[in-house]
From Swiss-Prot:
Record note on cofactor: May also use Mn(2+).
Family the entry assigns: Belongs to the NRP synthetase family.
Protein name (database record): Beta-alanyl-bioamine nonribosomal peptide synthetase ebony
Induction comment from the UniProt entry of this chain: In the brain, expressed with a circadian rhythm with high levels at the beginning of day and low levels at night (at protein level).
A GO biological process held by the record: cuticle pigmentation
Record note on disruption phenotype: Reduced histamine levels in the head; specifically, in the central brain, beneath the basement membrane and in proximity to the lamina neuropil. Fewer synaptic vesicles in the terminals of R1-R6 photoreceptors. Loss of carcinine production in the head. Photoreceptor response to light is abnormal. Electroretinogram (ERG) recordings lack 'on' and 'off' transients probably due to an impaired synaptic transmission to postsynaptic cells. Induces a darker pigmentation of the body. The pigment stripe near the posterior edge of each abdominal tergite is darker compared to wild type.
Annotated region (Adenylation), positions in chain: 26-540
Length: 879
C-alpha cells in the first residue's frame, strides 16, 4: 500500500499573542527602568576622549511625549487629514542620531506611522513617495532644505523640540492621540516596485510585535547584555527589530553614525568598547568584517569581537563559503551565525536557519533559509496554488501574523491573496514573495527569483525600475539592465545602453552621474555603452553575451590588450615607486572596468571601489610592506593622500639589510637547523601549511595535521645534516618565529608518503620536474631548492611579512655562502609570489592550479578559483 506524498507546507511554532501598541510597551519599560540608559550616541566627528551623549528611559519618554503633543497640535492646527488608506503618516528625513529614535517614538505616541526618507534619496524618488503616501508632515534635520519636500509641511528637529519644550511630559491618553489612539499602522517602508515604481509597505503594530516576541523567545537577552547596536539604515526593514527589540526589553541602544558603519576599523572598535553581543548585518558587511578581523586580530590571544556571539545575516543570499569562513575565525559552539529570509512585506524575516559548524555547512550547496518564525506558515505552491511535493520547487508564499497590511493606496493587490488552505483566521491571507523554494530534510532552500528583483546591500532592487530610469535618459535608444553575479562579492548592476544615432558624444561616467540624480546610490548601475545589442536567433536580447562582455572587460587575467591608464605626472620623484605599488594594486582589485585614469587626484570609490574591496586593497598593500590602516584608507580624499600615508607609515620594501625589518620591535636572528629544533619547527610548519596552505585547503578533510609531522620526522636528520636550513629567533623572547627548509635539488631524500599530501608533492613535481631536469644547471651544489617556509601562528600580519622578508634575504645569503648557482622554488601563496617579484626572481612557469589533472584522471584542485596560480621561480644568486 503506497503512502501519501509529503507536501511542502511548513508551520512555525504557535505562541500566545495579544495585540498591543508598541509605544505602550516602551512606556511600561520606562516605569521599570526609568533611570537606566536608553540611548547612547557619539557623533562620528566627536573629538577623541569626549563622552558620548546619553538619555535615560525617563528622559527619552518625556521628550517623546512632549514632541507627540506638538505633532498632534500641528496636525489639528493645520487641518491635516489622513491619507486615502486612513493613515496619519509622518515622514522622517534624518541622519542616525539620538534625536532620530526619540522622534520615531513620538510619532507612535501621537497616533501616527513613521515613513523614513533617506537624506541621500534623489529628488524624483522623494517626489513619488510624497505624492503617493501623502504624509501630513516631514520632520527633517536642520541642515536639510525644506524645499526638497515640494510643499509638504515640514518641521526641523530644532523646531520640533523647541516648540514642544513647555508641553506636558506625561504619557498621552488615547483620546489625546490622532484617531483616538486607534492606530493600526506603525511604519511605512518604500521598496522597489515590480512596475518600476517604488511602493510603500504598510506595517501594523501587531505584525511588528509578533516578530519581536519571536525574537525575544528564540534569542533572549542575557543578564550581562546591557547595550545593543542600531546601525542599519532606517529605510531597511531590519532596522525595526534591531532598534525596537532591545528598547522594549530595557536595554540601551547604541546609535551608530553612517560614517562609522562604513569603516570596519571604527565599527569593530565601537563594538568592542561596548561589548556588543549580537549583530544584524548583510552578508556583504559580514565579509568585510571577517576580512578585517583576520587581518588585524586573527593571531591575538583574545580575538577581536569575541564577545559578539550572535550574528544574524539578512537581506542577501548567504553563501556556504562565507558562512564557513565565519567558523575559520570564530569558535563553533560559542559563536552562532543565523541566516534569516524574508522581505519588507513579512517584517523582514519569515524563516531562519542556524549555521552551527563547518561540518554541517559542508552538507549543503547553498545555506538553507530554514524554518518559519512563530505564528507563521510557509507554503511552496505551484502555478495553480497547490502545494508541491517535498523536494520539488514551488513559489514561496507566507501567511500569519508577520504579514504587512498591504501597500499604500492598495497597489499590487495580487501580492496579498485570500488563503484557500487556511483553517485559522490568522492565516487567512497569503503573501506572494516572488521567490522560488524547495523543502529538503525539513528545511526550506532558496531557489531564486520569479522576476527581476535582486538584493543589493540588503535593499530590494527591481531591475525594471532601474531600466525604466535608464531608458528615460534623453540620449538612450535602448537599455537593458542586468545583475552580474547576484549575491556574490563582485555583484554589480549593469546598464547596457545603445545610444540614439543622433546622440552627441557622451561618456559612461557622465550617464552614471545623471542616473545618480534619479536613483538611490545602491540602485545606480554601471553603464556600458554598446555599438549594437547582441540578439539571439529568435530576435530576443542575448543577455548572456552582454554579461560575458562585462566579464571579459573586468577579467584581469583576460585580454592583455586592455591596459589600465596610470598618470604619474603629478607624483613627486621620491614617491613614484610607492605610487606604482598603489596604482597597480588598485587597478588589480577594481579591474579593467574603471574608465578613468588612475592619478593622484583619483578617488578610490569613484573609480569603482567599495567597502569590501577597500579592505582587500589594504590587505594587498600590507602584503607589499605598507603599514596603512583601513580608516586611513577610507578617509583619504584621493589616491595622492593614500600615497603620502603609505610613504609616511612605512617606506617601500627595500632589499638592503637595514630596511628588511618592517617591525622594529622584532629582533631577528637566523640560526642553522639543529636536532633540538624539531618540535618547534614541526609546530610552525603544521600551523602554516595545515591552516593556511593554498593547495591543501582543496584536499580537506582528507589531510591531517599528523601528515605533515610524519614527513618532517622522516627527513629531519637529513635536513640537519645537509646544513642548508635554518630557524629564525626573536631574540627579545628567545622564541622561534620562523623556519626555512632547503635542500640541494639534485640530492633530496626519498620520502614514502602514504597520505593525501602525496597529491600535493606530485603536483609540485609536475610543475618543477621538467624545468629542473631540462633547463637548470646540472650536478650537485648548483640548485638550492627552497621547498618549505613557515612562520609562527602568533605573528600578526606585519610581523609575518617582516619575518618572511628576513627569511628570503637569509636564503639568498645561504645560497651565496654555499656557492650555489641559484635558488629554485614554487610559490602558491600570493605573499610569497609578491616577495619573489620584490627579490627579482625569474618566472619559469605560471600554472593555473585548477587545471591540474592527477594520474588517476581526477582534478584534485578543481574547486580552486581560476586566479589561483602556482608559480615556479628561479634566481641566480649572483644577480
Amino acid at each position: 500500500m503506497g503512502s501519501l506524498p509529503q507536501l511542502s507546507i511548513v508551520k512555525g511554532l504557535q505562541q500566545d499573542f495579544v495585540p498591543r501598541a508598541l509605544h505602550r510597551i516602551f512606556e511600561e519599560q520606562q516605569l521599570r527602568h526609568a533611570d537606566k540608559v536608553a540611548l547612547i550616541y557619539q557623533p562620528s566627528t566627536t573629538g577623541q576622549g569626549m563622552a558620548p551623549s546619553q538619555s535615560s528611559y525617563r528622559q527619552m519618554n518625556e521628550r517623546a511625549n512632549r514632541a507627540a503633543r506638538l505633532l498632534v497640535a500641528e496636525t489639528h492646527g493645520r487641518f491635516l487629514q489622513p491619507n486615502s488608506d486612513g493613515d496619519f503618516i509622518v515622514a522622517v528625513c534624518m541622519q542616525p542620531s539620538e534625536g532620530l529614535v526619540t522622534t520615531l517614538l513620538a510619532i507612535w505616541k501621537a497616533g501616527g506611522a513613521y515613513l523614513p526618507i533617506d537624506p541621500s534619496f534623489p529628488a524624483n524618488r522623494i517626489h513619488h513617495i510624497l505624492l503617493e503616501a501623502k504624509p501630513t508632515l516631514v520632520i527633517r534635520d536642520d541642515d536639510i532644505d525644506a524645499g526638497r519636500f515640494q510643499g509638504t509641511p515640514t518641521l526641523s528637529t530644532t523646531e520640533l523640540y523647541a516648540k514642544s519644550l513647555q508641553l506636558a511630559g506625561s504619557n498621552l491618553l488615547s483620546e489625546e492621540m490622532l484617531r483616538g489612539g486607534n492606530d493600526h499602522i506603525a511604519i511605512v517602508l518604500y521598496t522597489s516596485g515590480s512596475t518600476g515604481v517604488p511602493k510603500g509597505v504598510r506595517l501594523p503594530h501587531e505584525s511588528i510585535l509578533n516578530r519581536l516576541q519571536w525574537q525575544w523567545a528564540t534569542f533572549p537577552y542575557t543578564a550581562n547584555e546591557a547595550v545593543s547596536v542600531f546601525k542599519t539604515a532606517l529605510t531597511f526593514v531590519d532596522s525595526i527589530a534591531e532598534l525596537w527589540g532591545p528598547l522594549m526589553c530595557g536595554l540601551a541602544i547604541l546609535v551608530v553614525p553612517k560614517a562609522v558603519t562604513k569603516d570596519p576599523q571604527r565599527l569593530v572598535a565601537l563594538l568592542e568598547r561596548y561589548k556588543i553581543r549580537r549583530l544584524v548585518l548583510v552578508p556583504t558587511l559580514l565579509r568585510s568584517l571577517l576580512m578585517y578581523l583576520k587581518m588585524e586580530g586573527g593571531g591575538a590571544a583574545q580575538k577581536l569581537l569575541y564577545n559578539l556571539q550572535i550574528w544574524v545575516c539578512s537581506g542577501e543570499p548567504l553563501s556556504v563559503s562565507l558562512a564557513s569562513s565565519f567558523f575559520d575565525y570564530f569558535d563553533e559552539g560559542v559563536h552562532r551565525l543565523y541566516n534569516f529570509y524574508g522581505s519588507t512585506e513579512v517584517l523582514g524575516d519569515v524563516t531562519y536557519f542556524a549555521c552551527e559548524s563547518k561540518k554541517q555547512l559542508s552538507l549543503y550547496d547553498n545555506v538553507p533559509i530554514g524554518i518559519p518564525l512563530s505564528n507563521t506558515v510557509v507554503y511552496l505552491l505551484d502555478a495553480d496554488y497547490r502545494p508541491v511535493k517535498n523536494g520539488e520547487i514551488g513559489e514561496i508564499f507566507a501567511s500569519g501574523l508577520n504579514l504587512a497590511a498591504g501597500y499604500v493606496n492598495g497597489r499590487d493587490p495580487e501580492r496579498f491573496l485570500e488563503n484557500p488552505l487556511a483553517v485559522e483566521k490568522k492565516y487567512a491571507r497569503l503573501y506572494r514573495t516572488g521567490d522560488y523554494g524547495s523543502l529538503k530534510n525539513g528545511s526550506i532552500m532558496y531557489e531564486g527569483r520569479t522576476d527581476s528583483q535582486v538584493k543589493i546591500r540588503g535593499h530590494r532592487v527591481d531591475l525594471s525600475e532601474v531600466e525604466k530610469n535608464v531608458a528615460e535618459l534623453p540620449l538612450v535608444d535602448k537599455a537593458i539592465v542586468l545583475c552580474y553575479h547576484a549575491g556574490q562579492v563582485d555583484q554589480a548592476i549593469l546598464a547596457f545602453v545603445k545610444l540614439r544615432d543622433d546622440a552627441p558624444m557622451v561618456t559612461e561616467m557622465q550617464m552614471e552621474a545623471r542616473l545618480k540624480d534619479k536613483l538611490a546610490d545602491y540602485m545606480t548601475p554601471q553603464v556600458v555603452i554598446l555599438e549594437h545589442v547582441p540578439l539571439l536567433v529568435n530576435g530576443k536580447v542575448d543577455r548572456q553575451a552582454l554579461l560575458k562582455t562585462y566579464e571579459t572587460a573586468n577579467n584581469n587575467e583576460g585580454d592583455s590588450s586592455i591596459v589600465l591608464d596610470f598618470d604619474y605626472s603629478q607624483v613627486p620623484e621620491d614617491l613614484k615607486l610607492t605610487a606604482r605599488d598603489l596604482f597597480e594594486t588598485v587597478g588589480g582589485v577594481i579591474g579593467r572596468s574603471t574608465r578613468a585614469t588612475l592619478a593622484p587626484h583619483s578617488n578610490f570609490y569613484e573609480l569603482g571601489g567599495n567597502s569590501l574591496n577597500s579592505i582587500f586593497t589594504v590587505t594587498l598593500l600590507r602584503e607589499k610592506g605598507y603599514n596603512i590602516g583601513i580608516s586611513e584608507f577610507i578617509a583619504a580624499k584621493n589616491l595622492g593622500e593614500i600615497i603620502e600615508k603609505m610613504a609616511a607609515n612605512h617606506d617601500a620594501v627595500q632589499l638592503e639589510e637595514e630596511s628588511l625589518n618592517a617591525c622594529p620591535h622584532l629582533k631577528m636572528e637566523a640560526v642553522p637547523l639543529r636536532l633540538e629544533h624539531r618540535q618547534e619547527v614541526i609546530d610552525i610548519i603544521v600551523a602554516s601549511f595545515y591552516n593556511k596552505a593554498d593547495l591543501e585547503q582543496w584536499l580537506k578533510p582528507g589531510v591531517l595535521r599528523t601528515d605533515y609531522s610524519d614527513i618532517l620526522n622522516d627527513i629531519w636528520n637529513v635536513l640537519v645534516e645537509r646544513d642548508l636550513s635554518f630557524v629564525v629567533y626573536d631574540t627579545n623572547t628567545d622564541r622561534i618565529i620562523g623556519t626555512a627548509l632547503n635542500f640541494d635539488a639534485r640530492n633530496e631524500p626519498e620520502v614514502d608518503i602514504k597520505s593525501k599530501l602525496l597529491i600535493v608533492f606530485e603536483f609540485l613535481e609536475f610543475c618543477e620536474g621538467p624545468i629542473r631536469d631540462n633547463y637548470l644547471p646540472k650536478g650537485l651544489n648548483q640548485i638550492l631548492h627552497s621547498f618549505m617556509m613557515g612562520t609562527a601562528e602568533k605573528l600578526n600580519p606585519r610581523e609575518n611579512i617582516a619575518c618572511m622578508h628576513f627569511m628570503e634575504h637569509e636564503v639568498l645569503r645561504v645560497a651565496r655562502e654555499k656557492q650555489f648557482a641559484g635558488i629554485f622554488t614554487t610559490n602558491t601563496s600570493p605573499l610569497t609570489q609578491q616577495l619573489a617579484d620584490v627579490y627579482h626572481y625569474k618566472t619559469l612557469l605560471n600554472f593555473q592550479v585548477n587545471e591540474y589533472v592527477h594520474s588517476d584522471g581526477s582534478r584534485p584542485f578543481g574547486d580552486a578559483p581560476d586566479e589561483q596560480r602556482a608559480i615556479v621561480h628561479w634566481k641566480e644568486v649572483g644577480k
